[in-house]
Amino acid sequence: MSYFRYIDNGEGPTKLFIGGVHGDEGKDVLPLIKLLSYEDFSPGQIYIYNFDKTPYISTIHKEFYQSEQGKKILDLIDYYKPDFYTELHSYNIKHFDRLTSLERLDSQGIPPLIDCGQYVLCSSVSPLIRRKHFTKQNICQTLEFPSFRGEDLNLSDDELFEKYDYSYDLSVEEYMSFLRLITLSKNRDDFEKRVLKDYKKQADLALKYVKIIYGLDFPRY
């Protein structure tokens, strides 16, 4: 069943979080969403959605935003007009190297995802919506949590660690660390300070990539 949570924290930024963006990713991120407590949020209006399984269409393709699910997400964005917009995704851990490779710029015209550690990845949102549905002052983030498909589902925790040097608990800790950075930030300046303190390397990469895609005068988030 789809999940929705609203938190009225008074005056402050509007924050929209969406999990289960496409495919069956919602089952991976819902347990993480439920780890967030009331104390994890800044003042403001908080809206959290996690959707059931839908057909998988990549958000870097315009066909996604023409689909029923894509239109639903755009309607939420245009309705709430969030100051902070965060997509909560999961991905097949086998694709880690491909998703973080600079070859994505040549093959797909988009920058690679950025490694935050423990197989957790971050980036901005799809270029197809970043400028059309948001302002430069808005914070737009994508967070990706590692998941498993196919034969990997049959491996034990020890076997997964041996194959990928992967720990579920450490990935959860890293994912929640970045997610709480977003949930706790009171505005763009606060977010910038938190990112530069805890994720300086990733922030520098984000700036490099945004210059390639949007030019010099566009924010990295």
Language model features with spans:
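Structured catalytic-domain cores with a bias toward divalent-metal coordination
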Residues: 1-221
